[in-house]
């Protein structure tokens, strides 16, 4: 992708976050069917919560580790309060292959025998986007593949987009008055 296209995507994401916020969506769920994003979610939550959550403003960031949490969280998304929008991370290139091996157990999962987990997760991803987008706004950010280079691009994408989102919202992304308040109370309690 070109540099101009990348800048446009960051700007578009930041603008859409603010548009959804103004429309009353107060929660953003970052979701993926890729287990390698587990610790990335924690970084993303800290980035947006600490940068944007001030002056009684901000979109509350949460993450959905699918398919693990799809049943429980999916129920809320489909039938619960319409408080969130969802951003999916979709990986385009498969890194490894893991085939579901047949076993002797009689269960309802025999139809998956011989299928690759990549194929299963892609089917679940497409079905989830189709279902969730009927209820709430859904965005997709494509990641070419899971390697150091593309993770670096993803980190930069969200850092720049977070800065833009904060500026649009009218908050300073570089201070943390709420964190300083609890640290003051904690230090007093511990005698520092």
What is the meaning of each model-derived region?
Residues 9-192:
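A SIS-like phosphosugar-recognition module
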Residues 1-8:
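Short, small-residue-biased leader/transition segments that mark boundaries at the very start
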């Amino acid at each position: 992708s070109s540099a101009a296209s990348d800048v446009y995507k960051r700007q578009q994401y930041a603008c859409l976050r603010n548009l959804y916020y103004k429309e009353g969506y107060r929660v953003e769920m970052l979701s993926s069917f890729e287990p390698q994003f587990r610790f990335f979610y924690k970084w993303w939550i800290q980035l947006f919560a600490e940068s944007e959550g001030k002056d009684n403003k901000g979109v509350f960031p949460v993450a959905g580790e699918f398919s693990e949490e799809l049943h429980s969280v999916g129920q809320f998304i489909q039938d619960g309060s319409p408080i969130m929008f969802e951003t999916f991370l979709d990986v385009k290139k498969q890194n490894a292959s893991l085939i579901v091996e047949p076993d002797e157990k009689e269960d309802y999962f025999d139809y998956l025998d011989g299928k690759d987990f990549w194929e299963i997760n892609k089917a679940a991803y497409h079905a989830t986007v189709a279902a969730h987008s009927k209820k709430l706004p859904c965005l997709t950010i494509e990641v070419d593949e899971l390697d150091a280079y593309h993770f670096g691009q993803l980190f930069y994408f969200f850092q720049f987009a977070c800065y833009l989102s904060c500026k649009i919202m009218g908050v300073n992304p570089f201070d943390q008055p709420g964190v300083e308040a609890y640290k003051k109370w904690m230090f007093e309690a511990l005698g520092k």
